[in-house]
């Protein structure tokens, strides 16, 4: 519980929130993945929250240059990231299509 400000907030918050843990895990996953180009930028970041939720962006480059192989490798990495969401007590929201 937060107090009247007499103590440093950083010392009061002992537990990391699940979204922070997921972002850190995902960043480490990308950094250590053998298909990800470690010489280029990679990041996991939150975008601006909307009424539909809080978007999380995965930004990374692969070593692979051939398009079909690149698409398959990218999909495998993203599928693993999506599958891990529930392990952190989070969920993916998809806005339904209206006719």
Describe each region flagged by the PLM:
Residues 1-99:
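Structured, soluble regulatory/oligomerization domains located on the cytosolic or IMS-facing side
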């Amino acid at each position: 519980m937060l107090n009247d400000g007499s103590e440093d907030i950083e010392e009061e918050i002992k537990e990391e929130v699940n979204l922070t843990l997921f972002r850190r895990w995902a960043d480490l996953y990308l950094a250590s993945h053998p298909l990800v180009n470690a010489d280029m930028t990679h990041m996991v970041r939150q975008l601006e929250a909307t009424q539909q939720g809080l978007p999380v962006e995965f930004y990374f480059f692969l070593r692979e240059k051939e398009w079909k192989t690149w698409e398959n490798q990218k999909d495998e990495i993203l599928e693993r990231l999506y599958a891990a969401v529930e392990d952190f007590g989070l969920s993916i929201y998809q806005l339904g299509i209206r006719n």
